[in-house]
Amino acid sequence: MGLAMARRFALEDMNVVLSDIDESKLDAAVNEIRGNGGNAEGVVTDVALETDNVQLLDASIDAFGTVDVVCLNAGVQGSIGRSWALSNEDYKWTLGILLDGVIHGVRTFVPHLVEQDQGHVVVTASIAGHISSPFGAPYNIAKHGVATLAETLFHELKVERSNVGVTCLCPGFVNTNIVNATAARESGAVGSAVDDRGDQMLEFTQRALSGGLDPEVVGQQVFDAISNNQFWLFTDEDWDEPIAARAEQIVQRSDPRLQRPS
């Protein structure tokens, strides 16, 4: 989805800085944007490291003078399986990218935006930030955390009377390679599925993503949300009823029921 956002921004003659931990993929994305007439720079970044986030901000300012839109979008599926079968490393690695990465991004970039009193932050959460499916505990934990961080940030900026906007992007199934991103782990690390339940969930997720929304549609949705200063951005309406049903279960103090898209 990040590349789709960059493509859409470049169509508006926005200067684009892309980041990725995979240098070859990053170079290909930068060359594509430039090949289509856009201005783009690439910075190899491990979002789980605070120092890399600081370097990304510095490189962006060095390249283009300022930063106006920040998209905290790095994503992996992470390890999946029974929550008690996952190792501490499984949790740590997934949360490091999905949650710590966003925390580092907020702490690094938001002060710059607040100081100039303009700009926008796009935080990529997920439907998994509102619905808890089984056998994906690290991902669910991270996305619930990211959603509440975005909402907290929104309230704080309003209290501060800042002109900086926030969008919380909550994708459903989008045709991306997020599952394959787990392969970027260091050699010898535990794979994405740690048990038979993980295998089943991985197969389901891959099928669902392959039939999911075109990332280019999401890129347009993000651009529109920024333009309209819209906070909640859900990529489709398939999960509206399940989210409402979960909220009602909480209000009624009833046991959770497994939710599926309508």
Question: Can you say where each PLM-predicted feature lies in the sequence?
Answer:
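Canonical Rossmann dinucleotide-binding motif of NAD(H)/NADP(H)-dependent dehydrogenases/reductases
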Residues: 1-17
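The beta1-alpha1 cofactor-binding region of Rossmann-like NAD(H)/NADP(H)-dependent oxidoreductases
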Residues: 23-24, 44-56, 88
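Substrate-binding pocket helix/loop in short-chain dehydrogenase/reductase
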Residues: 81-83, 87-93
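Active-site helix of classical SDR
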Residues: 106, 142
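Residue(s) in the substrate-gating loop at a strand-loop-helix junction
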Residues: 126
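SDR active-site lid
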Residues: 159-233
